């Protein structure tokens, strides 16, 4: 088998149990265990576009990407293996959604790294499934139980809203800046003083607040937003709609689904993938930006001040500017010549 996460290695210790089961694997899928596990049938659901793409190649229609798995996709599954994400609210949202579609009696395995907060699974599932801890290894815990109560789930009950700059921001669990605008995005937005026109791409858009603020102030901007997270896609669409703005919102692993070129690429790029720290997405945003910028187009990003993006910007663009700086964040701009 290919390299597996510690949580997946714990699941490997119980492979014999799944041989006669119809398995649904969901949650934070950090590897391709779903395409390698042996069972009567295996399906995989993820809300992360970059996790879905490799599964799609090996599993085809048995891999699902979206905010919530369709009932038709999960109804024949009798076993759920859920990989706990770092965000408890996201786990709650996903498990409530899944347990509304799965049948009573479905076996439930919940696994995750101890530092992720997986030990709160028993409390979270109280009244839905009685879980007990059945294994502990690789600094992970595995819980097991069966579904005793099918939940009621309405995604409209899960929205968080807040106000920023006279705009309404809509966000679902697991989306960055779900309850308030983060300091980095505030600093980035503070650097936009002049009127803007043309085509703008908000990369790693989260709840869509950056594009929404800029679009509201600059009605001649044509907005495109992208993210890997299905919850972010839904949140960005909702944020645009509630503020009466038009924009195209797409799922994309950095630029993988981007087909046009832009006058502006703006981003508050992530530097985490699951529990781990990863700068790959942010570096790819910079390295590949010239391919998606028009001549004279600008990349403007905010990043933690300690991250070494200056050298990458200079290597790719030849030079860069620092438009704003605090002790914690810097806003960089580079122009395609």
Swiss-Prot record:
Belongs to the methyltransferase superfamily. RsmC family. Monomer. Keywords: Cytoplasm, Methyltransferase, rRNA processing, S-adenosyl-L-methionine, Transferase. GO terms for cellular component: cytoplasm. It catalyses: guanosine(1207) in 16S rRNA + S-adenosyl-L-methionine = N(2)-methylguanosine(1207) in 16S rRNA + S-adenosyl-L-homocysteine + H(+). The gene is rsmC. One of its GO terms (molecular function) is 16S rRNA (guanine(1207)-N(2))-methyltransferase activity. It is found in: Cytoplasm. Its main location: cytoplasm. Its EC number is 2.1.1.172. Specifically methylates the guanine in position 1207 of 16S rRNA in the 30S particle. This is Ribosomal RNA small subunit methyltransferase C. CDD domains: AdoMet_MTases.
